Swiss-Prot record:
Keywords: Disulfide bond, Immunity, Immunoglobulin domain, MHC I, Secreted, Signal. The keyword Secreted applies. The gene is B2M. The lineage of its organism: Eukaryota, Metazoa, Chordata, Craniata, Vertebrata. It comes from Saguinus oedipus. This is Beta-2-microglobulin. Gene3D superfamilies: Immunoglobulins.
Length: 119
């Protein structure tokens, strides 16, 4: 009988322990195809390895939020950390600057990562 009480208690303690663990997101910004000025492409922001799941991701053009952005469903890895992909169509050129801005409880201020067209 004691075994049936201890096991559920251990499960509850484990679950509450997961909520206390915080991991900052890894942010990767890249284009689907190699950058070619004037040719349509997709800008991607892959955010991974974060916990808890509450996160805000914005794609930026010249520091301003891009409104027409799509994203994958929130998913989790074997280690219970989360990941997401945000993406939008764009046409690269020499003058515009693109970036991904992420807000998460592990950051004191939002973190912005610029797109490097040479990556």
């Amino acid at each position: 009988m004691a075994r049936f009480v201890v096991v559920p208690l251990l499960v509850l303690v484990s679950l509450f322990g997961l909520e206390a663990i915080q991991h900052p997101p890894k942010i990767q910004v890249y284009s689907r195809y190699p950058a070619d000025n004037g040719k349509p492409n997709f800008l991607n922001c892959y955010v991974s390895g974060f916990h808890p799941s509450d996160i805000e991701v914005d794609l930026l053009k010249n520091g301003k939020k891009i409104e027409k952005v799509e994203h994958s469903d929130l998913s989790f890895s074997k280690d219970w950390s989360f990941y997401l992909l945000y993406y939008t169509e764009f046409t690269p050129n020499e003058k515009d600057e693109y970036a991904c801005r992420v807000s998460h409880v592990t950051f004191s201020t939002p973190k912005t990562v610029k797109w490097d067209r040479n990556m």
